[in-house]
Amino acid sequence: MMKGDNFQTQNTFHGILPTLPYLNQYSEEFNPSDLHQKISLIEDNSLDLWTDSYNEGQLMNRLIQTARIANEMNNISARDKIINTIQERLEDWLTYESNEVAFLFYYNQDWTSLIGYPAGHGQDTNINDHHFHWGYFIHAAAFMEQFRPGWYDDWGEMINLLIRDAASTDREDPLFPFLRNFSPYA
C-alpha cells in the first residue's frame, strides 16, 4: 500500500473494428462454402431455443455476427432472415402486452432497477451483471439501426432505459443509481 490522496492511470485506445473483413481475398485456406454452410445452420435458429435475458442476449449476439458475415459474403437472403429474427425477438423484449408472462422488462421501484424476465444468472435476485445482459440488447439495437436506419426512432427510448439502468450518468436520475456498474479499470 502507498499513502496518497489521488492517483492517475493512462491507457492508449487503439479503436475497435465493428466487423472483420471477408477473408476470401486474404487467405488461401479460406473456404466460402464452409462458411455458407455454417450460416445456413445458424440462420435457422428457432426462437424456441431462447431462454432468458442473458442467454438470449448471447444468442442474439451470435446471430448479429452471423448476419455481418453473411452481409460480407453477399448472402443477402440469409442476412435479411437473420435480421428479421433479431428484430422480432428484440422488439418482443422491448414491449409488453396484457397477460404476457415472458420476454419482457419491468421496473422494480424497491430496487431502482429494470428486471428482464425470464431472468438469468441472478440478474433479478442479485441485481448483478446488468451491464452484460443489457449490453447484448444495446448491441442488438445498434445493429438494427445500422441495417434498418430509423429503427432507433421507434425503440430508442426503451434502449436508453437499459443504458441508464446499467450506467446512468445523471446523479439526480429519479429511476436509477449513478453509474451502477462503473469500473475505472474496465
Question: Which residues make up each language-model segment?
Answer:
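Ser/Thr/Asn(+Pro)-rich, low-complexity disordered segments
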Residues: M1-H131, I159-I163, T169-A186
